[in-house]
């Protein structure tokens, strides 16, 4: 029965695809609204990441580009897009039409701007795609092995890389044509470098643990819960914060926030927050120091030359539920000390206070090697990379037309 329903779902989407392709062809000829369209999106319910910052760049620096942004009408970030103009309500008729009309589909996740991510992922696996060139902006720097993003499993026309070692890893192991992965820098880093500030705040931001990690009441028995709950109620930590007049903000990964209500703070200086109330990028800009386990957000903080401390109490278990290790080794390549116990973590925090919350020279040198592009021009380079892709397509089309004439 499940197979029948899935087949009917595919059939429905194929019919919709044929319909919108036909209507789209007409709209591109008759309406400037859908001609040479760049469609931009993140998860579909937000505007806080590389998609938003690149879209904002397009609207402010290249108003000649016909760009639109897909977002849910009840999103907390809707106003940010309305100010810029070009909002497309997610899942609407205009979303489907724009998706099939667009020359470029630009997003932070695979199958960028798709009305139904999972369905279009499976359709793409069968070679059924929209006409638009797919630009993958990413929503973080890749450090682990992600075979599902290899060329044999995923189609992309432009794969944006945010760091030099990441680019080299993707170029050498993911199997894409040479021109697809490009090191141009993440769009959101432009805002980081322009708006850097530092408050007396420690940010604790652990990553998620995979789809099969225990949830509900079973979550309380996990090492993840036990270690971070212990930290949130640690008297030594509270005393350290009091002595330094600091506060601590605990922001679990979005995928873990369904269980974040189970965490309790042991101090007025320790706050547990979520995506409903706080913007991740603002937290990263505001913090003086980041504590994380394996989350790639540490790249953002390291990009700002702020101290990072890794709290990795469950590395072996983590790999059972999460991605396997890639090119990045935390002890060899990381931007701060690796702690496996709460005692070691408190020691690292104490040392950071003694150093004036400045990143140590050894780690600064590592960031300089990792991020040779550090100039606030990532959006511009991304735009230029898409423009080159556009010219490449024109050249290919002209060559194909010339060949057909000669034949």
Predicted regions located by residue number:
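Membrane-proximal basic amphipathic "stem/tether" segments
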Residues: 1-37, 42-44
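C-terminal amphipathic helix plus adjacent low-complexity
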Residues: 1-5, 9-10, 24, 28, ...
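Active-site and donor-binding regions of nucleotide-sugar-utilizing enzymes
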Residues: 37-192
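Conserved catalytic-core segment of nucleotide-activated headgroup transferases in glycan assembly
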Residues: 49-55, 187-263, 339
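Short acidic-hydrophobic, aromatic-tinged amphipathic segments that line or gate anion-handling sites
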Residues: 87-93, 271-276, 334-348
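Donor nucleotide-activated moiety binding/catalytic core segment of transferases
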Residues: 89-97, 254-299
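A short, gly/pro- and small-residue-rich
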Residues: 118-139, 221-230, 306-317
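Catalytic binding pocket for nucleotide-activated donors in carbohydrate/polymer assembly enzymes
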Residues: 263-265, 296-370
């Amino acid at each position: 029965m499940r197979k029948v329903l899935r087949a009917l779902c595919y059939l429905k989407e194929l019919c919709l695809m044929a319909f919108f392709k036909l209507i789209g062809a007409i709209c591109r000829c008759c309406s400037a609204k859908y001609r040479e369209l760049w469609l931009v999106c993140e998860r579909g319910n937000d505007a806080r990441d590389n998609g938003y910052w690149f879209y904002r760049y397009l609207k402010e620096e290249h108003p000649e580009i016909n760009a639109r942004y897909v977002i849910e009408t009840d999103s907390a970030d809707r106003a940010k897009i309305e100010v810029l103009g070009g909002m497309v309500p997610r899942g609407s008729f205009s979303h489907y039409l724009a998706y099939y009309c667009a020359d470029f589909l630009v997003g932070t996740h695979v199958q960028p701007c798709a009305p139904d991510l999972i369905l279009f992922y499976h359709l793409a696996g069968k070679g059924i795609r929209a006409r638009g060139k797919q630009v993958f902006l990413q929503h973080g720097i890749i450090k682990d092995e992600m075979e599902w993003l290899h060329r044999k499993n995923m189609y992309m026309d432009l794969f944006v890389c945010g760091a030099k070692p990441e680019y080299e890893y993707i170029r050498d192991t993911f199997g894409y044509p040479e021109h697809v992965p490009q090191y141009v820098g993440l769009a959101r880093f432009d805002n980081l470098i322009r708006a850097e500030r530092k408050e007396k705040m420690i940010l604790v931001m652990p990553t998620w643990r995979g789809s099969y990690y225990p949830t509900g009441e079973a979550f309380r028995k996990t090492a993840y819960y036990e270690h971070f709950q212990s930290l949130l109620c640690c008297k030594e930590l509270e005393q350290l914060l009091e002595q330094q007049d600091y506060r601590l903000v605990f922001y679990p990964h979005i995928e873990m926030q369904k269980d974040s209500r189970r965490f309790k703070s042991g101090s007025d200086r320790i706050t547990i927050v979520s995506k409903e109330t706080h913007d991740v990028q603002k937290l990263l800009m505001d913090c003086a120091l980041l504590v994380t386990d394996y989350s790639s957000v540490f790249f953002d903080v390291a990009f700002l030359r702020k101290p990072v401390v890794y709290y990795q109490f469950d590395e072996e278990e983590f790999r059972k539920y999460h991605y396997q290790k890639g090119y990045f080794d935390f002890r060899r390549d990381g931007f701060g000390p690796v702690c496996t116990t709460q005692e070691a973590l408190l020691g690292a925090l104490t040392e950071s206070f003694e150093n004036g919350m400045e990143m140590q020279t050894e780690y600064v040198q590592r960031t300089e090697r990792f991020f040779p592009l550090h100039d606030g021009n990532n959006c511009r380079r991304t735009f230029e990379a898409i423009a080159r892709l556009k010219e490449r397509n024109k050249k290919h089309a002209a060559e194909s037309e010339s060949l057909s004439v000669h034949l």
